[in-house]
A protein has these predicted regions:
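Asp-based, Mg2+/Mn2+-dependent phosphohydrolase catalytic module
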Residues: 1-31, 38, 42-43, 47-113, ...
Length: 169
């Protein structure tokens, strides 16, 4: 299932060093919100996230939020952390990601997407040729029914992915 396989994995977004982006020529960092930057419907970022965002902005990288949530939900969080956003993205469909690339003036090869879900963030990134997909571990267990179901669907895919990368490391 190559479309569900991330290009790279980190435990949390705060574990990704700025040098990672520079080494790969990545200039546009597209970020998921829920369970990547904050918990669901929470206006406060997880510990260390604001500092991570500020450090990447200081490195002259462009960061933006891409979310399937409504503009009202995304706007309140985006304003708090100082980022612009594209809402109603309909991930894994790629038109939201394409809109973000066009809005900020970067090619797919200069773009990465960071998120915690295989079936939205990673699949969406992998469906747009050239985009680097980065999976991060969710910060918290899912509380919502459908998201818990999706996590059970992700589990066997992630087991195979981690077995493969551990075999090669």
């Amino acid at each position: 299932m190559p479309f569900l396989t991330p290009d790279v994995y980190f435990s949390h977004i705060t574990d990704i060093p700025g040098s990672f982006f520079e080494e790969r020529g990545l200039k546009l960092i597209i970020l998921d919100v829920d369970n990547t930057l904050t918990s669901h419907n929470n206006p406060t970022p997880f510990p260390g996230v604001q500092e991570w965002i500020d450090a990447r902005k200081g490195e002259r990288l462009t960061l933006a939020i891409l979310s399937n949530n409504t503009p009202d939900r995304v706007r309140s969080f985006a304003e708090k952390v100082g980022l612009s956003f594209v809402a109603n993205a309909a991930k894994p469909l790629t038109f939201g990601l394409s809109r973000a690339c066009k809005k900020y003036g970067f090619s797919s090869k200069e773009t990465c997407i960071i998120g915690d879900q295989l079936f939205t963030d990673i699949l969406g990134g992998n469906l747009k040729p050239g985009v680097t997909s980065i999976l991060v571990q969710p910060w918290e267990p899912e509380q919502h029914g459908f998201l818990r179901v999706k996590r059970t669907w992700e589990a066997p895919i992630l087991r195979r992915y981690f077995a493969k990368i551990n075999k090669h490391s």
